[in-house]
């Protein structure tokens, strides 16, 4: 018979992570907040869609705030206190998401805009005619 391992089944142990990085990806249609530790392993994440918003409401600043609070709460449960914020994209929820992280009790040490800017890359979508 093969030797049994000592580890019992079940959920992974929560690790204590004092500081990390929050990536906020804000598009016109949704806002995704991912909080990772310093090495890049994801601690918690939330999006406007996972917070219960559907359709056009996912692109609103309030949906971004709700998603940000949800991700921050889960990260703080694992001991996170300080974060650096990387913001990407042109969406409406950028500032609101940052404010919600601060309001949840996380100390923001750095805010950096990492939106990719093309050096004349892909052709943009055609202008809307309403």
From Swiss-Prot:
Family matches, as SUPFAM superfamilies:
Translational machinery components
Q: What does this protein do?
A: Located on the platform of the 30S subunit, it bridges several disparate RNA helices of the 16S rRNA. Forms part of the Shine-Dalgarno cleft in the 70S ribosome.
One MF term in GO for this entry?
structural constituent of ribosome
Keywords from UniProt, A to Z, are: Ribonucleoprotein, Ribosomal protein, RNA-binding, rRNA-binding
Q: Which family does it belong to?
A: Belongs to the universal ribosomal protein uS11 family.
Please list the residue ranges that the record marks as compositionally biased, kind Basic residues.
8-17
Coiled-coil features, chain-numbered ranges: none
**One record GO biological process:** translation
* Organism of origin: Acaryochloris marina (strain MBIC 11017)
Q: Which GO terms describe its cellular component?
A: ribonucleoprotein complex; ribosome
Task: Tell me what this protein is called.
Answer: Small ribosomal subunit protein uS11
Top-rank lineage group of the source organism: Bacteria
Region of interest (Disordered), ranges: 1-21
**Assembly with partners or alone:** Part of the 30S ribosomal subunit. Interacts with proteins S7 and S18. Binds to IF-3.
């Amino acid at each position: 018979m093969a030797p049994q391992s000592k580890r019992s089944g079940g959920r992974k142990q929560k690790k204590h992570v004092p500081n990390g990085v929050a990536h906020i990806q804000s598009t016109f249609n949704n806002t995704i907040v991912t909080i990772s530790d310093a090495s890049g392993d994801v601690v918690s994440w939330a999006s406007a869609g996972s917070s219960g918003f559907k359709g056009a409401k996912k692109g609103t600043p309030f949906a971004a705030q709700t998603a940000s609070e949800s991700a921050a709460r889960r990260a703080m449960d694992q001991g996170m206190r300080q974060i650096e914020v990387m913001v990407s994209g042109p969406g409406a929820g950028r500032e609101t998401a940052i404010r919600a992280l601060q309001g949840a009790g996380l100390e923001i040490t750095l805010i950096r805009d990492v939106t990719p800017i093309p050096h004349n890359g892909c052709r943009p979508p055609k202008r809307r005619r309403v």
